[in-house]
Amino acid sequence: MRPPAFWFTPPDSPALAARLLAPLGQAYAAATARRLRAPGHRAGVPVICIGNLNAGGTGKTPTAIALMQRLAARGIEAHVVSRGYGGRLEGPVEVDARRHRAADVGDEPLLLAAFGRAWVARDRAAGVRAAEAAGAQAILLDDGFQNPSVVKDLSLIVVDAAVGFGNGRCLPAGPLREPVEAGLARADLLLSIGGPEAQRRFATDWPALPVPRLTGRLATLQMGMDWQGARVLAFAGIGRPEKFFASLRAEGAELLRAEALDDHQPLGEALMKRLEIEAMALGAQLVTTEKDAVRLPPSFRQKVLTLPVRLEFDDATALDAALDRLGLAARS
């Protein structure tokens, strides 16, 4: 399901639907606050939570990849622990791309496993214990900011600068899992992802936030593919597929058709065959995201191109300082 438009009206002028649903949003926020009072497991290694306040995609996966690579460059073996949304395995189990599929462990953990060791566990505390026992020197929690089962040593909140915190209301009246003020009071860093205009708008709409702010953008990873003038049929089942389509256009591709799928939507044979027939009729190449690509049926993996993106920080000084404080300085 796509999020309703009224979630993203200005906070000072909420839509009628948001006002009508406000009591339910307040109840949701109260339930979250009660849940967060529960005690959590404290690991023997630093735990870094990559979370968000909004429901849906904000850029956590590229942020996790960037942190894995940053810690690896410091000589730190970081393991990712994910709940494995969309997968059938309860875990804790280490993701193995040679034997696991997205239907087993979820698409995000399968993608993250290409960059380091990743675990899936419905019980996050059990996943953290398993990762620590397997030699993790640091643990990245993929999501879980609103889950108290694991004590976090550093919480990094990720927000899409283009949409900010929406109308500032909690589910179902808005996109938030908890109020902005309450969430940021527990956070250590805020990362807003987007281009210059989106960053300026975010800073205007959400000024004076009580947490150090990092900024960054998603940049296309150059793989030798010349997209200029390429005729493509693009499809994406991510939080905001329009960002992927915009990236293709920015690379110069001729986007003949854009199919926005639901986040984590299964890519079955029937759907892929339909898209293949449409692409052939248009004389277009099928293109998708890295995260969607791990859900492709085996028969389509050689037929679909991907446009990989990576997070680039504008200034990571505050992040590096936070990692140093956790004892994760570069090791020889």
UniProtKB/Swiss-Prot annotation:
GO terms for molecular function: ATP binding; tetraacyldisaccharide 4'-kinase activity. This is Tetraacyldisaccharide 4'-kinase. It comes from the Bacteria. The keyword Lipid biosynthesis applies. The gene is lpxK. InterPro entries: LpxK (IPR003758), P-loop_NTPase (IPR027417). It comes from Cereibacter sphaeroides (strain ATCC 17023 / DSM 158 / JCM 6121 / CCUG 31486 / LMG 2827 / NBRC 12203 / NCIMB 8253 / ATH 2.4.1.) (Rhodobacter sphaeroides). Its EC number is 2.7.1.130. It is an enzyme of class 2 (transferase). Transfers the gamma-phosphate of ATP to the 4'-position of a tetraacyldisaccharide 1-phosphate intermediate (termed DS-1-P) to form tetraacyldisaccharide 1,4'-bis-phosphate (lipid IVA).
